[in-house]
Amino acid sequence: ICTRLIDDISDIVSSDAYTQEYLSERLANAGLLPMFGFPTRVRNLYLKDPQDQGKLPSEDVVSRDIDMAINSFAPGHEIVKDKKVFKSIGVVDYEYNKLNHTIRPKSKSLNVYTQPLCRCKSCGYSTVVDANPQIECPVCGNEMEHIKICSPLGFFVDYEKTPEDFNGDYDWYSPNSDVRLDCEQYLSEYSTVHNMTIRNNQSPSQGRVHLVNDNMGDFYCLGRDNKGRYISRAALEEPKSQTIVLQNEAKYAFVASKTTGVLTLSVDKVPESICLSPIFEQNVNSFAVRAAFLSWGYLVRKAIASYMDIDSSELNVGYY
C-alpha cells in the first residue's frame, strides 16, 4: 500500500482494459476494491428499442452477469421471457445524450480489445498481451493463433420481429466458455502436499482471468449497421440476412475478463507409466486427461464451497 498503491491506481485509470467511468467502480473491477455494491458486470439483452420508448434504464430487458451473458445473449441464442421466445441478433448498449435529450447507441458498445487473445490449440495456453503478440507457445512450442476479442456492453433482439409464443420448445445452447488464466508470472508456489503442487496469487489484482466464448471455434461475425448497432447476419432470417447493409464485418470471440484470487493444483511427481500431457500428438488420451482434471477441479470447488459456506457458482473451474 505504501509503495505501489498510487502507481497501481494510475495504471488502472489509464488502462483500456476497463470500461467503467467512475474511479471506485474501475478499481473494484481491477481487484483493488471489493465488488460489493457495484453491479458493473451486469449486461442487458434489450427486448425493445429504448430509443422508441424514450427512457433509460429500459424496463424491457433481461439482465445477466457478463460471465453468463457472453453465452446466453450471444447472437443466435434464444431465451424465454413472459412466455415469449426472443433471439439475440447482435451487440448494442445505450446512453443518454444530454445535449439534445435523446437516447443513442454507445459508440463503443462492442468494446473491442486493442490486443488479441493469443491461444495455443495444442496445450491450451493463452494470454492477452499488450504488445508484440507471441508467435510460438512458451509451453509446447507450437504456433499460437491470434484472435480478435471484445467484451460487449449489451445485446439486443430484432426489434422489428414479433416474438413467437413459447410452446415448450426453443433453441437452447449450453455454456461453452473456457476459463483462461493470464497471471502465470504472479503465481507463487507453496510446499508440496501429498504429491500435489499448489500455487496462487498473493494479491487479487494480480489474478487476471478470461472467460472466452469463441462459438465453438466459429467465432461471431459482426458488422455495424447505420444506427450504430453490431449485427450478426447468421442470427437474422432470410431475406433480411442478405439485404442488410453492414460495415466493417469481422470475426470476434467474446471475452469476460476479471481480476480475482487464483488457485492452481497439479500433480507433482507422475509415474513413467502414466502420461498426463494435454497435447494430443503426445498423448492420445489427452481428452480423458482434461476430463479427469476438470472432474478433480469441480470436486475441489464443492469442498471449498462447503468449507467456506458459499455458493459454488462463485468459483470458476478451468483446465490450464
Residues of each region from the PLM?
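Short, flexible, mixed-charge glycine/proline-rich loop motifs
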Residues: I66-S72, T102-L117, G124-N132
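Extended, highly charged accessory segments
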Residues: I1-Y96, D130-Y320
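Short cysteine-rich clusters marking metal-coordination/redox-active sites
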Residues: C118-C123, C137-C140
